């Protein structure tokens, strides 16, 4: 199956997207066909790369599906990047065209998405030819840029198979039904929002509820207005909602999923206490399309991202010989149909993370328990080394979160001329709580080893 075929056979009258406007599956299919014809008339062909820089909107989906249905390659770009950063990606990807919802100064041809929509709706361009017979599911359909496990932004080459399989793997655990209404507050340009919300919804003919604002009030109002049933978000949003939402505001939601970063246990607990719903934490990375694991509702555990998805293999690489001993920290490696083809035109960078047997080294430090559940410790590059001792920022952050009134915290390594690095923590208090350095230090001294305590707060 090709990624643009995932919404075929849906009831044409059922709702595909809502929010700013209602779009049925019949209208979606027609819009994609019109965009496809217009883009072909503009010269887009198989293998061309097309940049897409927009906020969450229905037209993002039209463009995405139209481009890949031509055998071309879509390059979704973070719409918070400035012109210079966007131009770097476009030049690196050798893009033939940029489609955007705002003006940008870049070195490739540009068309405003509103103009493209008008042309697709009114020009009646000649019908684009069918896909070449030799196009396969192993062809690249998307370049998703990431800093990856090393260095500067690189384009992860994601194939049709990668995306389709990851949607199938993910929704084997997080169940979608046609009657579900799925909140789309995650950015569509990001592989997390793209796969888990947009593609997951379309594959199962659910309704995408599009929201651009990340305001807790707007999220709550949208959930209530559209009777959202599945909410997929990032930890900071759960943190905000746990402090502000009314318990009754989430009564229509049967599934909450968190990803993009580790969900602090105090946040998960606060959310559960307020709304009575557990949050299924997942783990992934762009190079894996992106989902690798998720916590099932049938066998929930705290502080874990769950076992690997069906069809995904994982292992922990350590410096110890012999069989893996549960609880041992090492680097997570992943293998499966969801793993990228490689980095765009960077074979040497690809070799650093992807071996000949298909194992992707994630750059994440984890351990697994006897049941195969994955526990994220930290990014290798975030590891703090002080006097030769390894310090995991996540462990220090979890300790600081135990202090009453702490809303958010981040722990980083700071250069230290004597010890190599020292531990610095940045803390944001909840409304109504004063910052109390002595209290935080007392908790730290009680629960952490001496070298893990913060040099500065």
Protein language model features and the residues they cover:
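Conserved AMP-binding/adenylate-forming core of the ANL superfamily
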Residues: 13-57, 61-65, 82-87
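Conserved small/polar residues in nucleotide/adenosyl-binding loops
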Residues: 146, 446-453
